[in-house]
Amino acid sequence: ITLNLYAYLASWGMLRNSFLMQKDYLFSKPVVKILCKDKYSNLISFNPFKENIITDLETIMSLRDEIKEYYMGQTYIEDGTNKTKTISNVTDTLITKIILGTLGCVPAYDQYFVKALRRNKINGVFNLNSMKQIIQYAKDNKEEIEKACNKLGNLYTPMKIIDMYFWEVGIEK
């Protein structure tokens, strides 16, 4: 699973200019262990349309914090300088790409997605407030999102559909 995660991140350009480029795939093995914890197992069937979703959103925020905590403070050798560096910044983009690619319960907060959120007056920082706003957007557009899921053979989660939609909006000039 760790190798699959590494390949997935590489395919989305997440290794480029990143501390991950200086590590092999086993560096993220503890992240896979975090993702596989029982307390996060319900996120694999995350339903943004259900009522009383706050507990699920708080669980997602807990997962975010655990992933970030693992990476923060780890060291790597800086390319070209052979200096040991300490990881001091773990981006929302990296964390959300990991969660989207494994559990499918959040969109990926990359530059185009965030740009589209802001155009729609939605908070562009991966936090509880932003997720609440995205969930409200999902509920307001439930019919269209479910139609897209069905059209794509239910291969994508509702949050992946939201991710793709906002990414397309964000990339437009």
Regions found by a protein language model. Name each.
Residues 95-97:
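Cytochrome P450 catalytic-core helices
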Residues 100:
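C-terminal substrate/ligand-recognition segments
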Residues 1-86, 104-173:
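An N-terminal alpha-helical hairpin/helix-loop-helix interaction module that forms a charged
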